[in-house]
Amino acid sequence: NVAALLASPLADGLFQKAIIQSGIVSVASLSEAESDYPSDGVSGTISSQEILYQLLINDGIAEDLVAAKRHLANLTSSEIAGYLRAQTPANLLQAEQAAKPRKVGMTRVFPDGVVVRSDGIVGALKDPARTKVPVLVGTNRDETKLFNAMDPHLVEWGQPDGLWSFIDRMPLTIKNPNYYEAMSEYGSDFWKLRATDDVARSLTQSEQTVFAYRFDWDELPTIQDLDYADLLGAGHAMELLFLFPAAMEQTLVSKFVIGDGAESADRLSQQMRNYWAAFAYTGKPNLGLPAPQPTWPVWQAADNVERFLVLDSDQDQGIVSSTAALTLNGLLAKLEQDPRFDLMGRCQALYGLTYRNGDGIDPAAWQTFAAGQCLDRDYQTVTQLLERQQF
């Protein structure tokens, strides 16, 4: 995680530039990581205690969780340390998988005060005393579509026919296109808020130079009557194909992703690689380009100024600068009025969007969202759907 390295005191001064693509800046909870799970098994972080219990069960030392806790209570710290250090990586990973709680999401770094500062990644980025390096940071417009496309509650999968019948399972149709687009839009915007806009604001606050982008290319083909621009769009990791273009020549990528847009995709790829290479060499994506390209603006905190670059092909909007900026209050206000949802839908959307996102949403935001009408609702069905997702 480049963001974690950028924020780590141990890495301070070890590099001259940093590129953060679709980063994660939220951190795990130390208290949850060091404690037993509550009785309902809901926790946002995998517990080291629970992993240790699972190891004792897997090794046959304890029959169940109760026995594992009883056995552990009789061990000294040095005995526990010796037991853990004797475990193989495979044993540790197997125990971690079995010990996952309800609600836990993507693995996040721990603000242990040594490797990562106790005030977390964002806190470190705001510190003007840190060594200053130029940063290139961004996300893709439709980040969450890659994950939503694999959710059987949102997309119907099945056996394709015709030319594609040799494939066992493919996405066949989006069950509710308006809902799918809305959930993907908010999920991706929340990601951009945390991973681009908030990061850029924090770095700018500490007087660092930031170049931000949003990748918008979505000229995917239609397969089995399903438009992959709607299904995947500018999804997570899509920009990597344009930075490592040899992947575009692979048969599946050329058929399922690039389609007939190879020429414009190649042009965008070359422009992106020019920017990335210039930044890697000089810390300035506009310096030393082999041919004229749109100027990449430095992120600025002022209102109504060009602050990030939109990366798209010349068959669409092309490469353009944008003055847009996301804020939590702005996203919540937009969701609160979005006609694609009724009130219950808005409440469920906010619940789902924030269920596994690490730092979560400030409880005060829940108090004020929709005048507090989302506070006392039953989210059990949504929770069950979220916990069945396997990405």
Question: How does the language model describe each region?
Answer:
Residues I24-V25, Y37-D40, L154-Q159, D230-H236, ...:
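Short, low-complexity, polar/charged sequence segments that are solvent-exposed and flexible
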Residues R201-F391:
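Mobile gating loops/cap/lid regions near enzyme active sites that modulate substrate access
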Residues E79, D161-G162, R377:
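Coil-to-alpha-helix initiation sites in intrinsically disordered, low-complexity, charged segments
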Residues M170-A182, E249-D260:
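Short glycine/proline-rich turn/loop motifs
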Residues F166-D168, Y186:
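Domain-core and long-helix interface of multi-subunit machines
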Residues A3-A7, D12, K17-W157, E181-Q205, ...:
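Substrate-access "cap/lid" subdomains that shape
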Residues P9, Q87-N91, E96-A99, M170, ...:
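Alpha-helix boundary/capping residues
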Residues A149-F166, A291-P297:
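Short Gly/aromatic-enriched secondary-structure transition segments
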